[in-house]
């Protein structure tokens, strides 16, 4: 990245560390608070993952161009969104297809944001408000790549809250007693894991006979080999 951060980088304003070049003042961002993604700080830009660096620079450049159009009274540039969309789809396709050797807590949310952007399609955007929002979501997707280290979270807090209401593919919220359930399960696994299939078979048997309440768990210091059920027994 260039050393002169106060100059234009790839057509996008880059502020000196600690400053947002005109953010919220009308000199860098568009009027009415639109296009906050038209500027960035050098420190934040270099902290992004290298895999999204080029795309983030394009988002800044397109946002700055659109902000200029807004200030001059023109509509959004016709090719602005199609250009960003094509680049994002290519990048997101590689991201979605790549193996994840280490799970990151932001990955499910990042996939949800990515799928939302892909579903928008490549048609040109007609209003500045819509284009500004899409640029913000693109920047948010990039920043999820350095979640917990991002220095600009306040930019996303309201606009991106919608993504926390979506289904992220990580299951339902666990019940309040989930910790007690898993603690018992882990204790069983540590004692005799080979009994798991038999416990599951017993549970299925009991469920089929209409039993709703769980059996009493054996004490931590005793392993039960037989569970009595209405005069019968299930041997483990």
UniProtKB/Swiss-Prot annotation:
It comes from the Viruses. It comes from Equine herpesvirus 1 (strain Kentucky A). This is Virion protein US10 homolog. InterPro entries: EHV_Unk. The gene is IR5. Keywords: Host nucleus, Late protein, Metal-binding, Virion, Virion tegument, Zinc, Zinc-finger. Residues 1-32 are annotated as: Disordered. GO terms for molecular function: zinc ion binding. Phosphorylated. GO terms for cellular component: host cell nuclear matrix; viral tegument. Induction: Expressed late in the infection cycle. It is found in: Virion tegument; Host nucleus matrix. Residues 21-31 have a biased composition (Gly residues).
